[in-house]
Curated annotation (Swiss-Prot):
Its cofactor is K(+). Gene3D superfamilies: P-loop containing nucleotide triphosphate hydrolases, Probable tRNA modification gtpase trme, domain 1, tRNA modification GTPase MnmE domain 2. Binds 1 potassium ion per subunit. It comes from Escherichia coli O157:H7. (6S)-5-formyl-5,6,7,8-tetrahydrofolate binds at residues 23, 80, 120, 454. The keyword Lyase does not apply. Residues 216-377 form the TrmE-type G domain. InterPro entries: G_TrmE, GTP-bd, GTP-bd_TrmE_N, GTPase_MnmE, MnmE_dom2, MnmE_helical, P-loop_NTPase, Small_GTP-bd. Homodimer. Heterotetramer of two MnmE and two MnmG subunits. This is tRNA modification GTPase MnmE.
């Protein structure tokens, strides 16, 4: 297998459909056109032609599109054959194309990878293609499209350019120490560095919003049996996702629901009631519940308001609180307010949010929705926002750390050489986002998660 091979793959989802598309990219795409179509179509024009087998019989007929490189998605010669979407027809056409020497099936994401390697896209834009396909809401799709059009990359490139100018200034100060003006201590470098840090902080804030929009928040509902966990899951989901009975231990496995709150993806997980297991099946369910709790972004500690007047989680169930991960945020949810007559709404107890509601009637559930949105700092007015991945956040955080360390070196010891090194490392972190500086292993992991025909 060679990166110089001509590749082919189905660009439409498998299964039956009105249209099925095969995409070919590479130097032999021209030969495929002449062999299967009998001619080379006019560049960038839709040509209605028969698709022929080796013996001249017609396999299908449809639209052929010819994009000579470098003016194509991949930067190579690209041919698209748009025929009928029957799997048998597409398979016959694919087999016909693969009889031509030098062609092979594309790896997942290989078309996008070639576009990146041929400078048609940077890495953040290439990732945005997969994010656009996987978008689960209108807002996520719009933000992914912004990233694909270069909004995120432009912000990162602006930071890289600013760091380049700053590095030049710092290197000049190091190389010419005998000048009358001490460039390291005259305040100009510090001012420029502060500007870059402020710009980076703004991009980090937007990237966190973009990551929330892409990744969502994982919320686990946990508590004792019959506290109303499944009823709350149903209330948040807006449908009967979980079976609800008065029998303790009805939920024995993990139940998952994916919803949106004003565009923010929310992964709600209902777990088995936590208690001493009565049998092996329940024991496994409780074990899985704890696994989900340990991986959660937030835990909704569900309390049956008819069983206790306490509101402090450490008082209600100290053993449960003691077992939770140290920095895991907790929201105490006192359920069954329709029975206890408690005042609906949100308050605070010992640093934890406390919400009183009725999962059965739905009263107070909107308060919980707003709380979840606010607790993650999600901004519903993300005009012009972009999507971000965890690796992007890590690169931005590392760049910010290097800039802060560089500032400390500048102000503490006027150490120009150390500042210059921190600036270089910050620039390297930012360049990883767009792929200007990255490893082959990282590229392999990113593009292998794409669709075959992308």
């Amino acid at each position: 297998m060679s990166d110089n091979d001509t590749i082919v793959a189905q660009a439409t989802p498998p299964g039956r459909g009105g249209v099925g598309i095969l995409r070919i990219s590479g130097f032999k795409a021209r030969e495929v056109a002449e062999t299967v179509l009998g001619k080379l179509p006019k560049p960038r024009y839709a040509d209605y032609l028969p698709f022929k087998d080796a013996d001249g019989s017609v396999l299908d007929q449809g639209i052929a599109l010819w994009f000579p490189g470098p003016n194509s998605f991949t930067g190579e010669d690209v041919l698209e054959l748009q025929g009928h979407g029957g799997p048998v027809i597409l398979d016959l056409l694919l087999k016909r194309i693969l009889t031509i020497p030098g062609l092979r099936i594309a790896r997942p994401g290989e078309f996008s990878e070639r576009a990146f390697l041929n400078d048609k896209l940077d890495l953040a834009q290439a990732e945005a293609i997969a994010d656009l396909i996987d978008a689960s809401s209108e807002q996520a799709a719009r933000s992914a499209l912004n990233s694909l059009q270069g909004a995120f990359s432009a912000r990162v490139n602006h930071l890289v350019e600013a760091l380049t100018h700053l590095r030049i200034y710092v290197e000049a100060a190091i190389d010419f120490p005998d000048e009358e003006i001490d460039f390291l201590s005259d305040g100009k470098i510090e001012a420029q560095l502060n500007d870059v840090i402020a710009d980076l902080d703004a991009v980090r804030a937007e990237a966190r919003q973009g990551s929330l929009l892409r990744e969502g928040m994982k919320v686990v509902i946990a508590g004792r049996p019959n506290a109303g966990k499944s009823s709350l899951l149903n209330a948040l989901a807006g449908r009967e996702a979980a079976i609800v009975t008065d029998i303790a231990g009805t939920t024995r496995d993990v139940l998952r629901e994916h919803i949106h709150i004003d565009g923010m993806p929310l992964h709600i997980i209902d777990t088995a009631g936590l208690r001493e297991a009565s049998d092996e099946v329940e024991r496994i369910g409780i074990e899985r519940a704890w696994q989900e709790i340990e991986q959660a972004d937030r835990v909704l500690f569900m309390v049956d308001g008819t069983t206790t007047d306490a509101v402090d989680p450490a008082e209600i169930w100290p053993e449960f609180i003691a077992r939770l991960p140290a920095k895991l945020p907790i929201t105490v949810v006192r359920n069954k307010a329709d029975i206890t007559g408690e005042t609906l709404g949100m308050s605070e107890v010992n640093g934890h949010a406390l919400i009183r509601l009725s999962a059965k009637t739905g009263e107070g559930v909107d308060v919980l929705r707003n709380h979840l949105k606010q607790s993650m700092g999600f901004d519903t007015n993300m005009e012009g926002g972009f999507l971000a991945r965890r690796r992007h956040l890590q690169a931005l955080e590392q760049a910010a750390e290097h800039l802060q360390q560089g500032k400390a070196q500048l102000l503490g010891a006027w150490a120009g050489e150390l500042l210059a090194e921190e600036l270089r490392l910050a620039q390297q972190n930012l360049s990883e986002i767009t792929g200007e500086f990255t490893s082959d292993d990282l590229l392999g992991r990113i593009f292998s998660s794409f669709c075959i025909g992308k």
